[in-house]
């Protein structure tokens, strides 16, 4: 079976971690080119040491390389603004190329593998939302498949040391993109996202808190749905886990809570507490926020490549 060759744009924390994952665990994918803009970056140096072709001339440099002719997938781990330009350039040069967007640009549909990958297997560009989105949206979706969700709020706390310049430059885009994906993918009527960069030393693991306000429903059914969803995420992010039991609170009709911009709410409040430990392929285990992004992106591209192989076999 022919593996699909991939290029990664962005030689920072996320791009380098993703490269190592593909080299170690790629089933349908083969690492071909690492693209950066800083010739002194550690990511490009590491790629060269691992036998991967590199360029420090950005997307323009990639498209001038002989390897570009065989590239089927491109992962973009740059920034939201850069991705818009990168996608346009790539698509003009190679209209059928598959682009996995790890920035908050969201040109293509949001993709959270355990929730909606099957519906997006044939998209030319998919957006991996954000680290907070990949961790928390499955939990919102787990509740929404049991009861109608009116409001969901997530708080993602990540170690400051794990946030590179790209993450820091995209804080506003992080909150906007995650909030929208909570609604579009998670199924919430209204979504809100908050990110906290925790400067604690030694660095703490990624922690996520998910609050969901829904119609009254069986607490046992919701807890079971959440446990099932957590296990599905663990299939590609082994360090993903529920930190404690799911907490429930019934909000009675005669004592509703007032949500600014939404109105009064009564029903069921569900609180989910998560911890994400990284696989430590490139950065330490506390950087679960990077690990869940790269793991989700790899799972997405692997399934896309598998679908392409199956389709090619069917038409052969």
From Swiss-Prot:
<comment type="similarity">
    <text>Belongs to the acetaldehyde dehydrogenase family.</text>
</comment>
<dbReference type="Pfam" id="PF09290">
    <property type="entry name" value="AcetDehyd-dimer"/>
</dbReference>
<dbReference type="InterPro" id="IPR015426">
    <property type="entry name" value="Acetylaldehyde_DH_C"/>
</dbReference>
<dbReference type="InterPro" id="IPR036291">
    <property type="entry name" value="NAD(P)-bd_dom_sf"/>
</dbReference>
<dbReference type="GO" id="GO:0019380">
    <property type="term" value="P:3-phenylpropionate catabolic process"/>
</dbReference>
<feature type="binding site">
    <location>
        <begin position="162"/>
        <end position="170"/>
    </location>
    <ligand>
        <name>NAD(+)</name>
    </ligand>
</feature>
<dbReference type="GO" id="GO:0051287">
    <property type="term" value="F:NAD binding"/>
</dbReference>
<dbReference type="GO" id="GO:0008774">
    <property type="term" value="F:acetaldehyde dehydrogenase (acetylating) activity"/>
</dbReference>
<dbReference type="Pfam" id="PF01118">
    <property type="entry name" value="Semialdhyde_dh"/>
</dbReference>
<keyword id="KW-0058">Aromatic hydrocarbons catabolism</keyword>
<keyword id="KW-0520">NAD</keyword>
<dbReference type="InterPro" id="IPR000534">
    <property type="entry name" value="Semialdehyde_DH_NAD-bd"/>
</dbReference>
<feature type="binding site">
    <location>
        <position position="289"/>
    </location>
    <ligand>
        <name>NAD(+)</name>
    </ligand>
</feature>
<feature type="active site" description="Acyl-thioester intermediate">
    <location>
        <position position="131"/>
    </location>
</feature>
<feature type="binding site">
    <location>
        <begin position="11"/>
        <end position="14"/>
    </location>
    <ligand>
        <name>NAD(+)</name>
    </ligand>
</feature>
<comment type="pathway">
    <text>Aromatic compound metabolism; 3-phenylpropanoate degradation.</text>
</comment>
<protein>
    <recommendedName>
        <fullName>Acetaldehyde dehydrogenase</fullName>
        <ecNumber>1.2.1.10</ecNumber>
    </recommendedName>
</protein>
<comment type="subunit">
    <text>Interacts with MhpE.</text>
</comment>
<dbReference type="InterPro" id="IPR003361">
    <property type="entry name" value="Acetaldehyde_dehydrogenase"/>
</dbReference>
<keyword id="KW-0560">Oxidoreductase</keyword>
<comment type="function">
    <text>Catalyzes the conversion of acetaldehyde to acetyl-CoA, using NAD(+) and coenzyme A. Is the final enzyme in the meta-cleavage pathway for the degradation of aromatic compounds.</text>
</comment>
């Amino acid at each position: 079976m022919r593996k699909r060759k991939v290029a990664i744009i962005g030689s920072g924390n996320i791009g380098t971690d993703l490269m190592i994952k593909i080299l170690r665990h790629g089933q349908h994918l083969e690492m071909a080119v690492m693209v950066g803009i800083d010739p002194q970056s550690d990511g490009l140096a590491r790629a060269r040491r691992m036998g991967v072709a590199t360029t420090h001339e950005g997307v323009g440099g990639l498209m001038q390389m002989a390897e570009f002719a065989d590239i089927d997938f491109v992962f973009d781990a740059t920034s939201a603004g850069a991705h818009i330009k990168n996608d346009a350039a790539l698509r003009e040069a190679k209209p059928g190329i598959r682009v996995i967007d790890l920035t908050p640009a969201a040109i293509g549909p949001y993709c959270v593998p355990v929730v909606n990958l099957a519906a997006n297997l044939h998209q030319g560009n998919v957006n991996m939302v954000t680290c907070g989105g990949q961790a928390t949206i499955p939990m919102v979706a787990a509740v929404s498949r049991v009861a109608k969700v009116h409001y969901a709020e997530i708080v993602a706390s990540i170690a400051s040391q794990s946030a590179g310049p790209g993450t820091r430059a995209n804080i506003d885009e992080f909150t906007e993109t995650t909030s929208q994906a909570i609604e579009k993918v998670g199924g919430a009527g209204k979504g809100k996202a908050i990110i906290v960069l925790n400067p604690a030393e030694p660095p703490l693991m990624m922690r996520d808190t998910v609050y969901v306000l829904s119609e009254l429903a069986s607490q046992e059914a919701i807890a079971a749905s959440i446990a099932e969803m957590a296990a599905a995420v663990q299939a590609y992010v082994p360090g993903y886990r529920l930190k404690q039991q799911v907490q429930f609170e019934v909000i009675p009709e005669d004592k509703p809570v007032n949500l600014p911009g939404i109105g009064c709410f009564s029903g069921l409040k569900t609180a989910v507490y998560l911890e994400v430990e990284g696989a430590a392929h490139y950065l330490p285990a506390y950087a679960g926020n990077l690990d869940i992004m790269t793991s989700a992106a790899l799972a997405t591209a692997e399934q896309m490549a598998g679908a392409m192989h199956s389709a090619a076999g069917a038409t052969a």
